[in-house]
From Swiss-Prot:
Membrane topology: Lipid-anchor
InterPro entries associated with the record: Lipoprotein_NlpA (IPR004872)
Keyword 4Fe-4S among UniProt keywords: no
Additional detail: The MetNIQ system is also to be able to transport the toxic methionine analog alpha-methyl-methionine.
Lipid-linked residues (N-palmitoyl cysteine): 23
Signal peptide positions (record): 1-22
GO biological process entries: amino acid transport
The keyword Lipoprotein appears for this protein: yes
Protein name listed in UniProt: D-methionine-binding lipoprotein MetQ
Length: 271
């Protein structure tokens, strides 16, 4: 038994050593990078960046997909990935404040306008008093949605609320709308809910069910939106060669053309 224990211990130590060596090599490899993206349309765009990175810069990009907005920053902070490309600055700022992450933006990608969608109405004139309106529940996209609802005249918010208003900041609601906060991935499905008259949905999730702002949105965020998406890394690897190569690959004409195709003209260049 003692012999077996020593053998297992030795093997375990060897495996641990190899794992550590592998991690060290991967972190220093300027020709490999792991990037977190949201599954769906943004993943398709990132796959074009992946090809450009390989063809132009000899960089192997390993895409790691996520289904929500929370895990990509957690994985990046833990070192499970080297970068992510999915969020805008207000969301990143809120994450840094709430979770204490040491993350930093290293490049812009696109503005993906949010829009109001419905399977019940075709214009805001048809929206009935007391209707339920679904919005994302994370603080930054909730604020973004409320600001858009204000812009189209459905509600009025307190003065000076900035980019992060909540439903508590609604001071006028002439149609007595009921604001329903949902997880962002649930919003496309909410359109089939008999109780939901309208949903404000991020382009990433809307595209998963074939909707685009320009074609299907009842109202759409302006193109001068401050919510440009970012490529984000940790502070300790922001100047790494693999990061620089990936940013160059993403900010290419090929990726811009791909984004416009995937989002049917709904992607606005942010660099």
């Amino acid at each position: 038994m003692a012999f077996k224990f020593k053998t297992f211990a030795a093997v375990g130590a060897l495996i641990g050593s190899l794992a550590l060596v592998g991690c060290g090599q991967d972190e220093k490899d300027p020709n490999h990078i792991k990037v977190g993206v949201i599954v769906g349309a943004e993943q398709q765009v990132a796959e074009v960046a992946q090809k450009v990175a390989k063809d132009k810069y000899g960089l192997d990009v390993e895409l790691v997909t996520f289904n929500d907005y929370v895990l990509p920053n957690e994985a990046l902070s833990k070192g499970d990935i080297d970068a992510n490309a999915f969020q805008h600055k207000p969301y990143l700022d809120q994450q840094l404040k709430d979770r204490g992450y040491k993350l930093v933006a290293v490049g812009n990608t696109f503005v993906y306008p949010i829009a109001g969608y419905s399977k019940k109405i075709k214009s805001l004139d048809e929206l009935q008093d007391g209707s339920q309106v679904a919005v994302p529940n994370d603080p930054t996209n909730l604020g973004r949605s409320l600001l858009l609802l204000q812009k189209v005249g459905l509600i009025k918010l307190k003065d000076g609320v900035g980019l992060l208003p909540t439903v508590l900041d609604v001071v006028e609601n002439p149609k007595n709308l009921k604001i329903v906060e949902l997880e962002a991935p649930q919003l496309p499905r909410s359109l089939d809910d008999a109780q939901i008259a309208l949903a404000v949905i991020n382009t990433t999730y809307a595209s998963q069910i074939g909707l685009t702002p320009a074609k299907n949105g009842i109202f759409v965020e302006d193109k001068d939106s401050p919510y440009v998406n970012l490529i984000v890394t940790r502070e300790d690897n922001k100047d790494a060669e693999n990061v620089k190569k990936f940013v160059q690959a993403y900010q290419s004409d090929e990726v811009y053309e791909a984004a416009n195709k995937v989002f049917n003209g709904g992607a606005v260049k942010g660099w």
